[in-house]
Amino acid sequence: MATSKSGGSSKNGRDSISKRLGVKRSGGQFVKAEEIIVRQRGTKFHKGRNVGLGRDYTLFALSSGKVEFKTLKGKKYVNII
């Protein structure tokens, strides 16, 4: 028979790994074709000229050029110029 009570287990101590989301290339920065510009959940940023949209909503460059961020009618767009 145990002489002392068993210790309680903690309900803390869990954390999910970070998903490394966010803007990867800033405005005015030069990018090559197929470079990732934004990693996001949903369309926080919308695709503009020469920008592709992946199935996980990742924005990537379709051609080489400079990154441009624009806001039109309350929506943020990413273009390559």
UniProtKB/Swiss-Prot annotation:
Gene: rpmA
SUPFAM superfamilies, sorted: Ribosomal L27 protein-like (SSF110324)
Keyword Ribonucleoprotein: yes
One Pfam entry name: Ribosomal_L27
Alphabetized UniProt keyword annotations: Ribonucleoprotein, Ribosomal protein
Protein name: Large ribosomal subunit protein bL27
Region (Disordered): 1-23
Compositional bias of kind Polar residues: 1-11
